């Protein structure tokens, strides 16, 4: 594993309106809002049962508000793959299944505790028991749990209290190259994600790494020449804000500051 302990990065959220607003309010300084990105240990098949760094991985992502899964779609003989070949759909499915398995274990343990209390005459947990069974049915069918399926606020509150991994918003980051095999992997990943009601953003990390030393204007010109509209990090930040349901607003502050 390249990553053992979580690495935390704080990035500014891109907002094209800031410069224009700064001129309007005559602010001397702008403080953009930020987003915390956490790079955690990779996941392998069997992580829900402790394989690899599974227990550590699951513990780390339980603390996150949303998940971004980087999926390899490119070929490179110098970079090995744990399964010996590149298959984007398989890799995405492994992650999703491990999250489902972990939640099945969480819910079944909770179900056992509630069953004992119900048998002793405690009827207050009857609704929670019904919700657990409904969630288990969803997970056993291979689907993630969607809170918008539930209209009752109390039901949503109870489900959130389970701290399930499959309730968290998730999207895929497809790390691609310009080969035909990479394009096929990207297409396959898009089809899989569509079926799971999850989004995919396309990035070329190697290309951006190669031009990282260029100044901002040269970097922008190069990306445009390659048909890339914006840097990978910007795409990731924007998608993260979107799936978290965050709103971005700006307000003038004292001492000539403008805070986003």
Predicted segments with their positions:
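Conserved small/polar residues in nucleotide/adenosyl-binding loops
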Residues: 249-254
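Accessory interdomain/linker segments of ATP-dependent helicases and helicase-like nucleic-acid enzymes
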Residues: 240-247
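Canonical P-loop GTPase G-domain recognition
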Residues: 182-239
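Conserved C-terminal guanine-recognition region of P-loop GTPase G domains, centered on the G4
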Residues: 60-66, 70-197
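Amphipathic alpha-helical transducer elements in NTP-driven molecular machines
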Residues: 15-18, 31-37, 51-65, 89-92, ...
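Switch II of P-loop NTPase G domains
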Residues: 18-36, 40-66, 76-86, 153-160
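Short beta-strand-centered segment that lines the nucleotide-binding/catalytic pocket of NTP-utilizing
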Residues: 1-6
């Amino acid at each position: 594993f390249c990553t053992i302990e979580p690495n935390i990065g704080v990035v500014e959220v891109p907002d094209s309106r800031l410069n224009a607003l700064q001129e309007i309010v005559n602010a001397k300084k702008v403080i953009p809002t930020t987003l915390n990105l956490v790079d955690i240990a990779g996941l392998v098949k069997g992580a829900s049962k402790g394989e690899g760094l599974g227990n550590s991985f699951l513990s780390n992502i339980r603390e996150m508000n949303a998940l971004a899964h980087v999926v390899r779609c490119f070929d490179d003989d110098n970079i090995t793959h744990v399964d010996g070949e590149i298959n984007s759909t398989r890799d995405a499915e492994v992650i999703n299944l491990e999250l489902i398995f972990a939640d099945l274990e969480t819910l079944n343990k909770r179900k056992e505790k509630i069953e004992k209390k119900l048998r002793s005459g405690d009827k207050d947990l009857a609704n929670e028991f019904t919700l657990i069974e409904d969630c288990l049915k969803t997970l056993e069918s291979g689907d993630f749990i969607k809170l918008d399926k539930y209209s009752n606020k109390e039901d949503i509150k109870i489900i959130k209290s389970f701290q399930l991994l499959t309730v968290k918003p998730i999207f895929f980051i497809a790390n691609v190259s310009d080969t035909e095999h990479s394009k096929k992997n990207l297409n396959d990943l898009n089809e899989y994600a569509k079926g799971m009601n999850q989004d995919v953003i396309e990035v070329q990390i190697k290309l951006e790494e190669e031009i990282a030393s260029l100044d901002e204007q040269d970097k922008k010109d190069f990306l445009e020449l390659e048909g890339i509209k914006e840097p990978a990090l910007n795409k990731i930040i924007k998608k993260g804000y979107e799936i978290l349901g965050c709103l971005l607003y700006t307000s003038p502050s004292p001492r000539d500051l403008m805070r986003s």
